[in-house]
Curated annotation (Swiss-Prot):
Sites marked Lowers pKa of active site Cys: K129
The protein's name in its UniProt record: Octanoyltransferase
Positions of the catalytic residues: C163
Name of the gene this protein is made from: lipB
The protein's annotated pathway: Protein modification; protein lipoylation via endogenous pathway; protein N(6)-(lipoyl)lysine from octanoyl-[acyl-carrier-protein]: step 1/2
UniProt subcellular location: Cytoplasm
Binding site for substrate: R65, G66, G67, D68, V69, T70, Y71, H72, S132, I133, G134, G145, F146, A147
Further remarks about this protein from its record: In the reaction, the free carboxyl group of octanoic acid is attached via an amide linkage to the epsilon-amino group of a specific lysine residue of lipoyl domains of lipoate-dependent enzymes.
Provenance organism: Geobacter sp. (strain M21)
Top-level taxon of the source organism: Bacteria
Amino acid sequence: MICKDVGVIGYAEALRIQEQLVAKVQQGGEEALLLLEHLPVYTIGAGGSRDNVLDPELEPVRVNRGGDVTYHGPGQLVCYPILDLSRRGRDLHRYLRFLERFLVELCAGLGVACHTVPGRTGVWTGNGKLASIGVGVRRWVSMHGFALNVSPDTAPFSRINPCGMPDCRITSLSLELGEELFVDDLKETVAIRFQPFLHLHLPR
């Protein structure tokens, strides 16, 4: 698996890189893991509702992933796995549960206890949502992925119903631990842990 850290990047550029990697995997190339932070952007999934955009001046980017409207910005660790799911069971539900499990165990290793909520994709603590997940597939190659709140400004989330949930509070690793963390501090940990976790829980 290729691991690429592309730093802080605009959404359109990140999408372009994903599409290039997806095409390579479709042609039998190596799977990839993109690690990044986005410049501030609101996105909305293919089935998302405009009703969840509370600020009428907002124009979220419509993208080919599941889920509703969300915010991405500095302080979020965004991870886009580009995986050949045709060789991993062709089960999108199982893949979503795999990502949740990875996040729960990753955060536990950092000292933050979190959990999933039945019927709601993502990861929570008792204080709010810690990570959001939205994926898409093209000919059974995955794109998009998860966004883990490390130390983002949470104010932009007030302009939307995050993930389509009016009651959704937002938390972060920094808020949970009471100390400031940085995305760059976690990239290596995610890169090291993701591949063996993938082979264990979602083998080819």
